[in-house]
Amino acid sequence: MALPKLESPTYTLEVPSTGEKVKFRPFLVKEQKILMIAEESKDDNQIYDAMETLISSCTFGKVDVKTVNLFDVEYIFLQLRAKSVGEMVELNLLCPDDNKTRVPTKIDLTKLDVDIGEGHTDKIPLTSNITMHMKYPTLDNIRTIDKKGSETNSIFSILKSCIHEVHDGDTIYSRIDIS
């Protein structure tokens, strides 16, 4: 006779950028261990892989981390962490006045929210005829950044990967066609 299988509780979250409801479960001890090993490795790609695997597993495959906006990935990860480890996080923040004093602070992860301001748009007018249409960065965009290069080059690399289209009057140039 087989042992009974323990079921994890399930919760629902709303993906900030789409409003889509996604069911998720807390991460398990073995998944937390994968995260800790990735963190100890100090290898960004190993950390990204661990986050990708964890989010995919805990959302029952409903969230594709490769295509979801980075802020959605961060939000989902924080919600997973809140239900798995604890909703409160204690931090010692460095006081900006003297850069020496540490201030203990508690943050309730369930109260965190993504704020997309009123009038937010993905369009950047360059001239009266030319408009750039942007997309949010993804985890894959962040992975491809050359960490050994200058910070300025990294920023331009992210910006370049976030260009979706350029509109010049009636002509539309897709990112794929832009060199």
Residue ranges and their predicted role:
Residues M1-S179:
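Long C-terminal interaction/binding lobes of large macromolecular proteins
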